[in-house]
Amino acid sequence: MFVPCGESVPDLTNFTLLMPAVSVGNVGQLAIDLIISTLNMCKIGYFYTDCLVPMVGNNPYATEEENSNELSINTEVYSLPSKKLVVLQLRSIFIKYKSKSFCEKLLAWVESSGCARIIVLSSSHSYHRNDAQLRSTPFRYLLTPCLQKSVQNKIKSLNWLEMEKSRCIPEMSDSEFCIRIPGGGITKTLYDESCSKEIQMAVLLKFVSEGDNIPDAVSLVEYLNEWLQIIKPCNDGPMASALPWKIPSSWRLLFGSGLPPALF
């Protein structure tokens, strides 16, 4: 499934894998874009899979003419060995009935590559929130049981809120309670599979609505940064400036090109 760019397979032992879910507003994918661009991560390979719709395009992180002609495909892997980070970016939607197969293959690769844990950046429909969720922060997290032991103290210190359980069938008052992530794509499947396989996984998500979701992506990646400290403020004083996230060059065309002047 994983195909390296070079002749040898990179050593990812004890790396943290960051990846998005293809979810409402594409918030996770935009957040991963910010991480790759800000850290100037190096592409180390891609996934050869029939589970996603094929696509090809220009390098979304091009900074100069020399690398603007590089091609990108639907699933690519980037790494930053100095921070023990590896990132999987997904750029297209799943083919019908193929998402579960992708999750199984992905987790098999994670186990074989020696990655220490997975962090999934996702989103969920804001209109599905209950009253308690409406009155609190829009961010939630989930941890698999085997990850809770090692990070629960850190998470507790951040005062984060865990994703609440809701009725499996909302229309039935006697329905059992379970984790539901409407609009979350493969998030729930990945989480359930990781629980059953005892893989260390965290899910960080935000309740959002469709639209201009760049602010949601920035806030989600800053939520992640509270935990991992991927980047730090320019100064530590009370007037510390905003974190210096680097916007990818491809975001200039996020909503298409401008209106032709001839229209006016």
Curated annotation (Swiss-Prot):
A Gene Ontology biological process term: chaperone-mediated protein complex assembly
Keywords carried by this UniProt record: Chaperone, Nucleus, Phosphoprotein
Entry GO MF terms: molecular adaptor activity
UniProt-listed InterPro entries: Proteasome_assmbl_chaperone_2, Proteasome_assmbl_chp_2_euk, PSMG2_sf
Pfam families for the chain: PAC2
GO CC annotations on file: nucleus; protein folding chaperone complex
Subcellular location: Nucleus
Chaperone in keyword set: yes
PTM annotation, UniProt: Degraded by the proteasome upon completion of 20S proteasome maturation.
Superkingdom, taxonomy of origin: Eukaryota
Residue list for modification Phosphothreonine: 137
Assembly and binders: Forms a heterodimer with PSMG1. The PSMG1-PSMG2 heterodimer interacts directly with the PSMA5 and PSMA7 proteasome alpha subunits.
Family that this chain belongs to: Belongs to the PSMG2 family.
Function comment: Chaperone protein which promotes assembly of the 20S proteasome as part of a heterodimer with PSMG1. The PSMG1-PSMG2 heterodimer binds to the PSMA5 and PSMA7 proteasome subunits, promotes assembly of the proteasome alpha subunits into the heteroheptameric alpha ring and prevents alpha ring dimerization.
Name of the protein in its database record: Proteasome assembly chaperone 2
Organism annotation: Mus musculus
